[in-house]
């Protein structure tokens, strides 16, 4: 029996919606990353994007445990000397709700062209509404 290898054009992709209200950031991110890669499917192939589309709503209501809201630090750099910026989880959620989830998921995906294609299938919204009703996403409970 030959080992099955999925082809990119044969992959069946579903749409799922996750309500992130009062969910822990890391637990949501790990489940989202798993489904974006397609590891929950029997036809998973490491070098092919077999994952599903994930819509996360209420990303502004994500939480972290302990004192990470003030202690967890995110860094970015402008590219200029001395151009390093840092912010904590609480400030990032206030200013850009959902960006912490995007960064967490991106860090769990493969680096390179395959990972870039996978992260494009993640849609994060701070509120309940999203423009993907036409795709009829299925609710996914975590």
Curated annotation (Swiss-Prot):
Organism expressing this protein natively: Herminiimonas arsenicoxydans
Protein name: Large ribosomal subunit protein uL13
Quaternary structure annotation from Swiss-Prot or TrEMBL: Part of the 50S ribosomal subunit.
Gene3D superfamilies: Ribosomal protein L13
CDD domains: Ribosomal_L13
Gene that this polypeptide is encoded by: rplM
Any single GO BP term: translation
Described function: This protein is one of the early assembly proteins of the 50S ribosomal subunit, although it is not seen to bind rRNA by itself. It is important during the early stages of 50S assembly.
GO cellular component labels: cytosolic large ribosomal subunit
Superkingdom of origin organism: Bacteria
Keywords: Ribonucleoprotein, Ribosomal protein
UniProt keyword annotation of Cell division present: no
Molecular function terms, GO-annotated: mRNA binding; structural constituent of ribosome
Family statement drawn from the similarity comment of this UniProt entry: Belongs to the universal ribosomal protein uL13 family.
């Amino acid at each position: 029996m030959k080992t099955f290898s999925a082809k990119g054009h044969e992959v069946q992709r579903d749409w799922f919606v996750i309500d992130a209200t009062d969910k822990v950031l890391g637990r949501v991110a790990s489940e989202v990353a798993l489904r974006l890669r397609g590891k929950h499917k029997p036809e998973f192939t490491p070098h092919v994007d077999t994952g599903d589309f994930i819509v996360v709503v209420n990303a502004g209501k994500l939480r972290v445990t302990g004192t990470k809201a003030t202690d967890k630090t995110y860094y970015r750099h402008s590219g200029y000397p001395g151009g390093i910026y840092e912010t904590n989880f609480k400030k990032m959620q206030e200013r850009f709700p959902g960006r912490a989830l995007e960064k967490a998921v991106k860090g769990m995906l493969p680096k390179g062209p395959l990972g870039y294609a996978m992260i494009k299938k993640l849609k994060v919204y701070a509120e309940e509404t999203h423009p993907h009703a036409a795709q009829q996403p299925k609710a996914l409970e975590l």
